[in-house]
Design a protein with these regions (language model features):
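Beta-lactam-recognizing serine transpeptidase/beta-lactamase-like catalytic domain environment
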Residues: 1-208, 247-251
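Intrinsically disordered, low-complexity acidic/polar segments
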Residues: 185, 204, 216-218, 234
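Short, conserved micro-motifs enriched in small and acidic residues
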Residues: 88-95, 214-222
Length: 251
């Protein structure tokens, strides 16, 4: 299959093989691609407490809506293949992508996004209100399917020879499930996208990074790593415990 030869889903995710997903898209068809994209929250509102742009999923209806009913352009099989790798008319917000990767981490349970977890009283002695978790929908896919995707994303960060995020997470102290992306933008420029969640086998945090004109999906990896470092407290310098001498000020 192209440069990589016969491969499975895990390897395809690890090395970001477009040819694999061209073939997968061809076999699934645009209706299935659209169905699962929508169930995963792409092109849909996240439920955040602000107005938001829903973006859109690449499919024949979006194709006609964007070009007009009188356009001479026709939907073709090539459009299906481009849609399958996130190109053509796919347009998603960073929050949608963060919600999407969180849904992968939750084995298909998509939660509503919120800005505030809780509100505390002015003296921090009382919790005034707490935002309750809300399930938006469940993706119609098996647990095994999500496990395969997770393992491919872990290999993306952990495999020290071929993983597309290996330079930033190959030796990271916490297992990270990650995926790089390099969508083509207008004018021939390439944006960089990076989605990830951690710990891979007991998820707590999901991250989406977009770097406009970033050229390679790897450009988002160090930003995601900095976020994980802060969240997991890995960026704190280890304080050296030195014996205190008489008259020494305590810092």
């Amino acid at each position: 299959l192209g440069l990589h030869g016969p491969i499975d889903i895990q390897y395809a995710l690890m090395v970001s093989c477009n040819y694999f997903f061209y073939e997968a898209g061809n076999r699934q068809g645009i209706d299935n691609i659209s169905k699962y994209s929508e169930q995963l929250g792409l092109g849909s509102k996240t439920g955040i407490e602000l107005s938001e742009n829903t973006g859109h999923i690449s499919n024949p209806q979006t194709f006609r809506d964007l070009r007009g009913e009188n356009s001479e352009e026709q939907w073709t099989l090539g459009n299906v293949l481009q849609s399958a790798i996130g190109q053509l008319d796919n347009a998603f917000t960073p929050l949608q992508m963060a919600n999407y990767v969180a849904t992968l981490a939750n084995d298909g349970t998509r939660m509503r996004s919120h800005l505030v977890k809780s509100v505390e009283s002015y003296n921090l002695e009382e919790t005034v209100s707490t935002t309750q978790p809300e399930v938006l929908n469940q993706v119609e896919a098996s647990k095994e399917a999500f496990e395969q995707v997770r393992e491919g994303m872990v290999r993306c960060s952990r495999d020290t020879t071929r993983g597309s995020a290996r330079y930033y997470f190959g030796d990271y102290p916490i297992d990270v499930a990650a995926k790089t992306g390099t969508p083509q933008a207008s004018g021939g420029e390439l944006d960089a996208t990076f989605i990830a969640y951690a710990p891979a086998y007991d998820p707590e945090i999901a991250v989406a990074v977009v770097v406009e004109n970033g050229y390679s999906g790897q450009r988002g990896a160090p930003i995601a790593r900095a976020i994980f470092d802060e969240y997991f407290g890995l960026n704190k310098e280890q304080e050296q415990q030195q014996p205190q001498t008489e008259g020494q000020l305590i810092p």
